[in-house]
A protein has these predicted regions:
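A late C-terminal transmembrane helix in Major Facilitator Superfamily
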Residues: 129-172, 178-179
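C-terminal transmembrane helical hairpin of 12-TM major facilitator-type secondary transporters
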Residues: 81-129
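Residue-level signature of mid-helix packing/kink "hotspots" within the transmembrane helices
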Residues: 60-64, 68, 158
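Multi-pass alpha-helical transporter architecture, strongest
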Residues: 181-204
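Juxtamembrane intracellular "pre-TM" segments in multi-pass secondary transporters
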Residues: 1-20
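Transmembrane alpha-helical cores of Major Facilitator Superfamily
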Residues: 24, 57, 61, 116, ...
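Helix-to-loop junctions at the C-terminal end of transmembrane segments
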Residues: 66-80
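Extracytoplasmic gate region of multi-pass secondary transporters
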Residues: 14-56, 62
């Protein structure tokens, strides 16, 4: 009963929900790629499994580099601005996917480059959002908050994986569209649930 009350309380906290859902939707770009890339790169573009493994090996580099950069910037720039920059990188990488697919310029290397950009954005968002999400709740709710955030993250990953596997058969366009949708959701939630809410609260 107490646990249920705690979860209900967390669901009512706008900033906690804003940060948690921002993480979930932003990291969806990587989940979309992991689900779709074997179909797009191996089945559609004819990349060998060995070369595919090499391509995928470089994908986490974007996240790793962004985490390092974020650690350097966090004492100089407001954390929310770093998160917003991560959202913008995510959208840029997703739109690059759409452009490559619609222009006929898509190659395995360029597709991997676009997800590198998106993953760089996720690296700027991930740790900062988690830290701020937990900072908005009482210490006694930290465990429940972490579990609820993980539920949103994995739940959205499940939904994306289902739709991506159903849509992608002959083109990388659905990959770009799904990435664009999830990144636009991420930045919209962050702006309205976190940034706008914070300004409104200060005015009140």
């Amino acid at each position: 009963s107490a646990l249920l009350v705690g979860y209900i309380s967390l669901l009512r906290q706008r900033k906690f929900m804003g940060y948690s859902l921002t993480i979930s939707f932003q990291s969806g770009t990587f989940q979309v790629f992991i689900t779709a890339s074997p179909i797009v790169l191996i089945s559609v573009m004819g990349v060998s499994p060995q070369l595919y493994g090499l391509y995928v090996m470089f994908i986490p580099a974007g996240f790793i580099i962004a985490s390092f950069v974020s650690g350097r910037l966090v004492t100089r720039i407001p954390v929310n601005m770093i998160i917003l920059a991560g959202n913008i990188f995510g959208i840029a990488g997703a739109l690059m996917q759409v452009f490559l697919a619609t222009s006929g310029l898509a190659t395995p290397l360029l597709i991997v480059a676009s997800i590198f950009i998106s993953n760089f954005g996720t690296g700027l968002v991930f740790a900062n959002c988690y830290a701020l999400a937990l900072s908005t709740v009482p210490p006694s709710f930290a465990g429940a908050a972490s579990a609820l955030g993980g539920f949103f993250h994995q739940g959205w990953a499940f939904v994306l994986s289902f739709f991506v596997a159903s849509l992608i058969h002959t083109s990388s366009l659905p990959l770009g569209i799904m990435q664009t949708v999830t990144t636009i959701c991420a930045v919209s939630i962050f702006v309205f649930a976190v940034l706008w809410s914070g300004r409104h609260t200060r005015k009140v």
